[in-house]
Amino acid sequence: MSAKTDEILEQLKSLSLLEASELVKQIEDAFGVSAAAPAGGMMMPMAMPGAPGAAAAEPEEEQTEFDAILTEFPSDKKIAILKVVRSITGLGLKEAKELVESVPKPLKEGIAKEAAEDIKKQLEEAGAKVEIK
């Protein structure tokens, strides 16, 4: 690596979680990109367009990784949902609030079906609507 990239890497290592989160948002805004992984991104390389039988083979494979996505919530239940989101994700209050306010947003990605169902149950009990993909 060049000296410039080494210096940038060292500066990134020194950032707090909050600063890193703010940096990601600024990069997303500046370059018009999203740091969120696309839903089902792991499955895309398996089926190549034009490959014979690619479409037929895909439905037979059982999905093993799921995403729990917070889709909506009533505003009067926001505090209860924030508490559940913080306990599930381990995020700080500000990060959890930003996540909840930017629905629909994945809370956890690439998790087992049981874990996704548990997250869905907890959030629905708090009043939120959750999708599992």
From Swiss-Prot:
Name used for this protein in its record: Large ribosomal subunit protein bL12
InterPro entries per record: Ribosomal_bL12 (IPR000206), Ribosomal_bL12_C (IPR013823), Ribosomal_bL12_C/ClpS-like (IPR014719), Ribosomal_bL12_oligo (IPR008932), Ribosomal_bL12_oligo_N_sf (IPR036235)
Protein family according to the UniProt entry: Belongs to the bacterial ribosomal protein bL12 family.
Taxonomic classification: Bacteria, Bacillati, Cyanobacteriota, Cyanophyceae, Oscillatoriophycideae
Keywords: Ribonucleoprotein, Ribosomal protein
Superkingdom field: Bacteria
Gene3D superfamilies xref list: 3.30.1390.10, Single helix bin
GO cellular component, one term: cytosolic large ribosomal subunit
